[in-house]
Amino acid sequence: MAMVVGAWRDPQDDVPGAQGTQPAPAPPVQGPPAGTPHTPQTPGPGGPPSTPAQSNAASQQSQGDKQQQQQHIECVVCGDKSSGKHYGQFTCEGCKSFFKRSVRRNLSYTCRANRNCPIDQHHRNQCQYCRLKKCLKVGMRREAVQRGRMPPTQPTHGQFALTNGDPLNCHSYLSGYISLLLRAEPYPTSRFGSQCMQPNNIMGIENICELAARMLFSAVEWARNIPFFPDLQITDQVALLRLTWSELFVLNAAQCSMPLHVAPLLAAAGLHASPMSADRVVAFMDHIRIFQEQVEKLKALHVDSAEYSCLKAIVLFTSDACGLSDVAHVESLQEKSQCALEEYVRSQYPNQPTRFGKLLLRLPSLRTVSSSVIEQLFFVRLVGKTPIETLIRDMLLSGSSFNWPYMSIQ
């Protein structure tokens, strides 16, 4: 098939009668001689010139030859009969329409096999992922589609999906992606209450636990509404959130300036009511200190809401989760989120060339905050011994993040 592409890159170059070639006149049948019979292109002085009818006949014959030859051109994607050159390559109408629709809508496809499905006339509709992959591989050009008139509609969540795992590296596209991340945030500052934004305010035990529950719910609800995540298999969604919920919790705590005073935290964990050895108390307080340090380091960078959204997306889309059905796809989503953050920081903070690196360097240390400590500090009073991972799974499977059985979240 590749040989066909090379042979028909410009069909006019190989067709008789193309531009620059004068059709030979028909040899005279009657009348005086019109020059030597071996050189009909240069008739003698007495020879009659070509008539319009003869030229028209030659042109029609040439056009017919071109049409006949073009009918034998195969679609470089599926091998069906080509209808012409579309977006840089000869394709059939079906592959042309499929490619245009996929690029204009930025549709995301998933291969259920090994990303190497056969694409021919009989199988081209069985795997959209591999069909689009082949369209790009044979040289169909995205930019040729995007130069066309775009529908004047507001982009929706699905319109910012990846194609073939490759992000569209343009500023407007990444800006749109960040806008959708921000739009998915279910928790404006006011939702957590005024106490959250008052670092010097010492919150009561009940308020601390309620705030923690709100932040956990918000992390799950945000993930359910950002681009790409809802398109993943539910098992992958559960695996990603079960691994990263504690890191998202720390980012949310920093974003809302959650007060982290030691005494209320120890009381919330119930440590004041149960006897503990001195060593265990010291170890637990060390965990609290690590939590406090991570939050303070993020607050010191004055991270804005767009940066927080990108950081959370980078954390969420991690290929470290066990049992992912498509590791490469999740990696591409993380890379896309990282590119969006880099583009945003470069445009919004041009005088801080090291800002992007500083933000990324904060992420690995988030895992130093023990998830079991977060559970004991904030959730043991609400859910007892029920693992947070189980609650996250139930929230995703139920389709609602705000069905907490132990308290009412307004």
Swiss-Prot record:
Q: What's the domain of life for this entry?
A: Eukaryota
For this record, the Gene Ontology CC terms, alphabetical, are:
nucleus
Keyword list, A-Z: Activator, DNA-binding, Metal-binding, Nucleus, Receptor, Transcription, Transcription regulation, Zinc, Zinc-finger
Compositional bias, Low complexity, is annotated for: 52-68
Q: Which residues form the NR LBD domain?
A: 173-399
Region ranges (Disordered)? 1-68
The entry's protein name is COUP transcription factor 2
Q: Which parts of this chain are annotated as the region Important for dimerization?
A: 333-410
Q: What is annotated about its quaternary structure and interactions?
A: Binds DNA as a homodimer.
- The DNA-binding region ranges are 72-147
**Zinc finger regions, NR C4-type:** 75-95, 111-135
- Job of this protein: Ligand-activated transcription factor. Activated by high concentrations of 9-cis-retinoic acid and all-trans-retinoic acid, but not by dexamethasone, cortisol or progesterone (in vitro). May be involved in motor neuron development.
Location in the cell:
Nucleus
Q: Which SUPFAM superfamilies match?
A: Glucocorticoid receptor-like (DNA-binding domain), Nuclear receptor ligand-binding domain
Instruction: Classify the main location.
Output: nucleus
Tissues in which the UniProt entry reports expression: Highly expressed in the developing spinal motor neurons.
InterPro entries xrefs: NHR-like_dom_sf (IPR035500), Nucl_hrmn_rcpt_lig-bd (IPR000536), Nuclear_hormone_rcpt_NR2 (IPR050274), Nuclear_hrmn_rcpt (IPR001723), Znf_hrmn_rcpt (IPR001628), Znf_NHR/GATA (IPR013088)
Per UniProt, the ranges with Pro residues bias are: 24-51
Query: Which Gene3D superfamilies did the record assign?
Result: Erythroid Transcription Factor GATA-1, subunit A, Retinoid X Receptor
Molecular-function GO term, any one:
sequence-specific DNA binding
A Pfam entry, by short name: Hormone_recep
Could you confirm whether the keyword Disulfide bond appears in this record? Answer: no
